[in-house]
Regions:
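Conserved hydrophobic/amphipathic alpha-helical signal-anchor segments
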Residues: 15-65
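Periplasmic/extracellular, small/polar-rich flexible segments of pilin-like filament-forming proteins
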Residues: 49-122
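Hydrophobic membrane-insertion alpha-helices, especially the h-region
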Residues: 6-17
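Positively charged n-region of N-terminal signal peptides that target proteins for export
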Residues: 1-4
Length: 122
């Protein structure tokens, strides 16, 4: 009986460790998307201060996309400016990797308020 309890305790500890590692990896990827979108938000805010409107041209705000993992780099997210007006903008970070193999690709979005939300969960 004692050996069974030790085995069960070991298995539970092992599973807890696996779940913690998975959660830790997901948090790291999520923070990558949030960091990239916060940079876009700051660049768009500076652009608007200079030109009195937002832009949908990612090169105009001088955002430099890190090299994607699909191209031999380390970035898991492709950032794009989806729309912009005088008073609003929307930017998206879409994962280029299906992290859990379910066919869904993580998508995060930021707007002119700086509010970053996950719009598609992977």
């Amino acid at each position: 009986m004692k050996k069974i309890l030790i085995a069960i305790t070991f298995i539970v500890s092992l599973l807890s460790g696996i779940l913690w590692l998975r959660h830790s990896r997901l948090e790291k990827r999520d923070s990558e998307a949030r960091k990239a979108l916060m940079e876009v938000y700051e660049l768009e805010t500076a652009y608007k201060a200079m030109f009195s409107h937002y832009t949908d041209n990612i090169y105009a705000i001088v955002y430099i996309q890190d090299t994607l993992v699909t191209e031999g780099g380390n970035a898991n997210y492709l950032v794009s400016l989806d729309e912009a007006t005088d008073s609003t903008f929307k930017a998206t970070a879409v994962s280029v990797v299906d992290f859990d193999g379910d066919g869904q690709f993580s998508q995060w979005q930021v707007n002119e308020t700086g509010n970053i939300i996950e719009i598609v969960e992977d």
